[in-house]
Structure formats: structure tokens, C-alpha cells
Amino acid sequence: MKIPLRLLCFSLGWQLLLAPLAPAAAPDPIRAVLAAQVAAWNRGDIDGFMQGYARSGKTTFVSGDKVTHGWQTVRDRYAKKYDSRAKMGRLTFSGLTITPLGADAAIVLGSWSLQRAGDQPHGKFTLLFRRLPEGWRIVLDHTS
């Protein structure tokens, strides 16, 4: 009887060691942030779109060969590049995959596309979300 009990204790111990240390990040709040960003963009509201980003000097946006640091700098970049409703077009996100990295972080992979009168630019993105006191926010955005 002692051997099976030891085996049971050993087995349970390993299961506890291999179990996640923290609950996984919930994808629903992250999806809600992304949906709010799309809705804001499609209203022509860059400031509303930017609410999805961490309001921090460390927030980072990477696109092409350019790296932009800081929430305000990222916001200014968007405002300059998309200075009219025509340039903003209609945004959609698709193919979203959310991978929790623990209780307070997640990676999101997805595709973006803009429907505009003259063209339909599109690409991929990788976002690092962190759970902050104000909720889930993007701290790193790599868009191509």
C-alpha cells in the first residue's frame, strides 16, 4: 500500500510542477480592445484607436525599417500618415490568434486591411499586449 501511495504523491507532485503558474490571459478582453480600435478607426477617430495602446514612453511601433517609441510619437505618426477619412479607409482585422504568455501578457497575430477608393493596402501584425491597471493594452506593435 505504501508504494502506490508514494507513486500517487509523486505523480501529483509532477502535475503540480508542470501546471501553469498563473491563469492564462483571457482572449475576450483583448478581442474587445481590438474591436474598439477597429470601430474608432472606422469613425475616423485616431485618438479612440490609440486607446488600445499603453500610454507610455516605452510603447513601441515597428513598421518597415522604422521604429517609433512612445505613445504620443506613435499617435503623431498615425495622425500624419492618415490625415483624412479617405486615407483612413475602412479597417478590418482578421485571422486573429491570441497566445497567452501568462496572466498579464499575450501575443496577438493577425492580418489587417484597409478598404479605400483607390487601393486596398493590407498586411500582418504581431502585438504584445500587457494587462495594465487600465486594462489590456498594446505595448509593442510590429506591422508589415
Question: Where are the regions a protein language model picked out?
Answer:
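Short, low-complexity N-terminal intrinsically disordered segments enriched in polar/charged residues
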Residues: 4, 11-52, 56, 73
